[in-house]
Amino acid sequence: MTNGLYLDCHAGIAGDMLLSSLVDLGADVDYVHQHLLSLPLDQFSLNFAKKNKQGIQAMGLTIDFEEAHHHRKASDIFNMINESTLPNRVKERSMLIFDVIAQAEAKIHGMKIEDVHFHEVGAMDSIIDIIGSCLALEDLGIDEIKSSPVPTGNGKIKIAHGIYPIPAPATAEILKDIPLATFDVQSELTTPTGAAFIKALATHIGPLSAVSMSNIGYGCGTKDFEFPNVIRAIQYTATETTPNQVQVLECQIDDMTPETLGYFIEQVINEGALDAFYTPITMKKSRPATQLTVISSVTQAKEFEDFILKHTTSLGVRSYAVNRKILHRQFQTIHTTYGAILVKLAMKDNKIIKAKPEFEDVKNAALHSGQSFTNVYNDIQNEVRKHIQID
């Protein structure tokens, strides 16, 4: 059984909103506070209180400092975490989040990561938000994290470098390859801290799948809008082997080019199909053709039938339900000689039976190292076996 967290970021995500939602979910404030007090931080106090945001009761957070605090370099933060007595998983998760922000800032300013002088995350409240959220995850026993697409907001924002369009440069860099949601609001909805949390720890971006929801918490931001400025944190459980039913949609096509079919596959996957592929077949009178197959959830079958009829030359679609059984999958980021690599794990009976590095991470590592994909993949796979016990 996996204890998971789904973040509904319909109004964006910021560090204080996230930590507040986890406390509302049931994380022990004393556990979080005492661990934070063990770190060499400026004197501070955490004040959580319920607030009403357009009819939604949500937890809010105010952090008070006894005196003005200063920005810190990335290397200072990494050293502080490494030398701390924080739980190992809290250290790992916190480091991953800070690393995401450091890499974004380093690229934007043309610097080495260790020389990055954080503005957003070097501020003490952001350090507390990040490490505090990871402590809250640990207290709740969260094993995996998923998220909805995130909106960035519109307009302009004042940052350390002046007035800049939303999303801020660091936020935009972090959110590359992350699905975004449209929300036409003239304000910043997602901060670099919130974006980094999603980028570093979320293993899936999309709608919440069929799981058993066990608890829900709400965390609010400081801004007031005409909509509830809250993030919804949903705690769920998922079994390791999940039997379910899916819908298979098929049609046979003999008048579309491979390029057009390839484009269709990309589009239908982007629309949310579980899988899509085409197979060469031979039709009557020995005509070469293609069988197009789209797999969707049962509830979305009608939607994808219409999509196939609209975007292909087919005049009809066959549809039937099938049972499938899938192993529970979760993701873990490991540090290798090529940097942080996301690894997909397949679980059975509380044991890891398969582990595979994600293609995009291996590809990027190969491009940056100048080595062949095969060599880099084999090196990373060997390091995966050292970090992860596979039965």
Swiss-Prot record:
Record's catalysed reaction(s): Ni(II)-pyridinium-3,5-bisthiocarboxylate mononucleotide = pyridinium-3,5-bisthiocarboxylate mononucleotide + Ni(2+)
Protein name, UniProt field: Pyridinium-3,5-bisthiocarboxylic acid mononucleotide nickel insertion protein
Alphabetical UniProt keywords: Lyase, Nickel
Enzyme Commission numbers on file: 4.99.1.12
Gene3D superfamilies with a match to the protein in the record: mk0293 like domain, Transcriptional regulatory protein pf0864 domain like
Organism, as annotated: Staphylococcus saprophyticus subsp. saprophyticus (strain ATCC 15305 / DSM 20229 / NCIMB 8711 / NCTC 7292 / S-41)
InterPro entries in the record: Ni_insertion (IPR002822)
One BP term from GO: protein maturation
Major enzyme class: lyase
GO molecular function, one term: lyase activity
Entry function: Involved in the biosynthesis of a nickel-pincer cofactor ((SCS)Ni(II) pincer complex). Binds Ni(2+), and functions in nickel delivery to pyridinium-3,5-bisthiocarboxylic acid mononucleotide (P2TMN), to form the mature cofactor. Is thus probably required for the activation of nickel-pincer cofactor-dependent enzymes.
Stated family: Belongs to the LarC family.
